[in-house]
């Protein structure tokens, strides 16, 4: 039986821009802080490591190149000692960690979310299915075996989505169908509505994300919904501005947008503009009971005989090979990245020391 009452936290803070090492350490610091506060769950924003590349919305191709190169150099591989440090922090604090980061795999970056359990194991590894608009400059698409979200945990059925995935009706329907109870709506860094210039639609500023999309997710799914958000400082504005361009001087429009909502869509918590840190919530899963009794879109309030969703979780390979028995060789992304190997197992230790044989190395290599 899952816990029905527990403490959780959502991060609203400034990332360590373009700095993988510092970003990993800041992540561990927040995990330690949440653990010391008695939290069972801590949730980080979208691509918290090494920060959301908001510059891609404001620069041309040539201006983007130095920033893009540095961003890729500081993105986080899954099968790395840096990521294992974060997993160990989850284990040390006996806490679930929902972590958003720029994952680099081969030569492609992905908008990745992982759910790490209190033993340090990765129980959900997902990639944003479609980067939004100019995000395609930086990131690739998730695959069939990396987009599902909802995971059964001791905290209940927990799901996580990135940014505008939270307003995708098909992903929302999929999560509802799997009985989601707690949702992480991970957001990047966004300017406020005062920056809006016609014809840019209001979809593209922070307030609709914080105050329309996120509570709509909560009320439509009947879930506790935590919305961690990144922040910006004056120094962060400078770091994210290409050379030769005058940086913005007022970061306040980017701050104060994190939220936590109850299962009925009512606001539980929002930060002050100058708040940087953890937002806490006392979750009671029984608050989902009446919201779902009124509108359970995966059960008594749906008509699957009339409306159904087709989901394909197969990975589509660029190259397929025949196996010795005449079938098609296939693999899962999870297996290729070594996520099926227990944290600090003998296989991982051998790999770290270089003592593993070639076959074991190839099985876990990128």
Swiss-Prot record:
GO terms for biological process: cyanide catabolic process. InterPro entries: C-N_Hydrolase, C-N_Hydrolase_sf, CN_hydrolase, Nitrilase/CN_hydratase_CS, Nitrilases_CHs. It catalyses: formamide = hydrogen cyanide + H2O. Its EC number is 4.2.1.66. Belongs to the carbon-nitrogen hydrolase superfamily. Nitrilase family. Residues 6-285 form the CN hydrolase domain. Catalyzes the hydration of cyanide to formamide. Degradation of cyanide may be important for plant pathogenic fungi in infection of cyanogenic plants. Can also transform some nitriles like 2-cyanopyridine and fumaronitrile. GO terms for molecular function: cyanide hydratase activity; nitrilase activity. The lineage of its organism: Eukaryota, Fungi, Dikarya, Ascomycota, Pezizomycotina. It is an enzyme of class 4 (lyase). Oligomer of dimers, forming left-handed helical fibers. This is Cyanide hydratase. Keywords: Hydrolase, Lyase. CDD domains: nitrilases_CHs (cd07564). It comes from Pyrenophora teres f. teres (strain 0-1). Disulfide bonds: none annotated. The active site is at 46 (proton acceptor), 128, 163 (nucleophile). It comes from the Eukaryota. PROSITE patterns: CN_HYDROLASE (PS50263), NITRIL_CHT_1 (PS00920), NITRIL_CHT_2 (PS00921). Induction: By cyanide.
């Amino acid at each position: 039986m899952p816990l029905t009452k527990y403490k959780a936290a959502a991060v609203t803070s400034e990332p360590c821009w373009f700095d993988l090492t510092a970003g990993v350490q800041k992540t561990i610091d927040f995990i330690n802080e949440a653990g010391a506060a008695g939290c069972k769950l801590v949730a980080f924003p979208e691509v918290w490591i090494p920060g959301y590349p908001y510059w891609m919305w404001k620069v041309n191709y040539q201006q983007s190149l130095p920033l893009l190169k540095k961003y890729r150099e500081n993105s986080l591989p899954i099968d790395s000692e840096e990521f294992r440090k974060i997993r160990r922090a989850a284990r040390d604090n006996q806490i679930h960690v929902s972590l958003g980061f720029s994952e680099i795999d081969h030569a492609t970056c992905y908008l990745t979310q992982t759910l790490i359990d209190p033993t340090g194991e990765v129980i959900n590894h997902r990639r944003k299915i479609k980067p939004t608009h100019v995000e395609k400059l930086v990131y690739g698409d998730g695959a069939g075996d990396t987009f599902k979200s909802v995971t059964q945990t001791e905290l209940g059925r927990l799901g996580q989505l990135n940014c505008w995935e939270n307003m995708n009706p098909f992903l929302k329907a999929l999560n509802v169908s799997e009985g989601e109870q707690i949702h992480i709506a991970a957001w990047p860094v966004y300017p406020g509505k005062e920056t809006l210039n016609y014809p840019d639609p209001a979809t593209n500023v922070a307030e609709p994300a914080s105050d329309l999309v996120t509570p709509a997710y909560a009320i439509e799914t009947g879930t506790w919904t935590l919305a961690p958000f990144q922040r910006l400082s004056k120094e962060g504005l400078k770091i994210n501005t290409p050379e030769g361009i005058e940086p913005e001087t007022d970061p306040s429009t980017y701050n104060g947008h994190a939220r936590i909502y109850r299962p009925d869509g009512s606001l539980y918590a929002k930060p002050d503009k100058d708040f940087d840190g953890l937002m806490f919530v006392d979750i009671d899963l029984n608050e989902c009971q009446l919201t779902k009794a009124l509108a359970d879109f995966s059960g008594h309030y749906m008509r699957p005989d009339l409306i159904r969703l087709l989901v394909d979780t197969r990975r589509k390979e660029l190259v397929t090979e025949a196996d010795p028995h005449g079938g098609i060789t296939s693999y899962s992304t999870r297996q290729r990245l070594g996520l099926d190997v227990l944290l600090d197992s003998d296989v991982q230790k051998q790999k770290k020391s270089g003592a593993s044989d070639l076959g074991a190395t190839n099985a876990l290599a990128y």
